[in-house]
Regions:
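N-terminal ligand-binding/catalytic initiation module
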Residues: 1-102, 110, 120
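Short, contiguous, pocket-lining structural segments
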Residues: 17, 132, 151-155
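Short, flexible micro-motifs
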Residues: 38, 69, 131-133, 156
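NAD(P)-binding Rossmann-fold cofactor-contacting core
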Residues: 143-157
Length: 157
């Protein structure tokens, strides 16, 4: 087996700017629409003190297959993505994936905004101030000239 790369949360943050995430998510959406990917629904398994959830996928265009797995234990969620070569089946990388999921989710909203929002849209509303809000807004601002952001949350701050 070749060298396996481990990317930490810090590595992912450094290596995955929103511009790259937008480009990649748009490409994968195109491949998915063309039937060139395999993406299965989430599998949820109950554990004595929490849950394990797994989402497998294959993307031949990039030579990778893998899964996103995450645990929910004591109110804490942790994500990891092991990736394998579609050519050899070898493990090629393991990514800590909290930030990856956050950026990917934001990028999906950015791609949707690019194609579905009016070209002159310059105001965005964001419901919620939690984990996903920052990258949702970052991605939308990357594809539209946003002049005003209205954020709605349960807490005044």
């Amino acid at each position: 087996m070749g060298r396996v790369r481990l990317l930490t949360e810090g590595d992912v943050t450094q290596l995955l700017p929103m511009s790259l995430a937008l480009e990649t998510v748009e490409s994968v959406f195109r491949w998915q629409a063309a039937g060139q990917t395999v993406n299965k629904p989430r599998v949820r398994l109950r554990a004595p003190k929490g849950f394990l959830q797994v989402m497998p996928a294959v993307v031949p265009e990039v030579g990778a297959m893998g899964l996103k797995a995450y645990t929910v234990v004591a109110g804490r969620v942790r994500f990891v993505v092991p990736l394998f070569s579609t050519e050899t089946g070898e493990l090629i990388g393991i990514l800590e994936a909290d930030r990856l999921g956050q950026v990917r989710t934001g990028a999906a909203s950015g791609v949707a905004t690019k194609y579905l929002a009016r070209p002159d849209a310059d105001v965005v509303g964001c419901y919620g101030t939690g984990y996903q809000a920052e990258t949702q807004l970052e991605a939308i601002c990357a594809v539209r000239r946003i002049r005003r952001i209205q954020v709605y949350g349960r807490d005044p701050e």
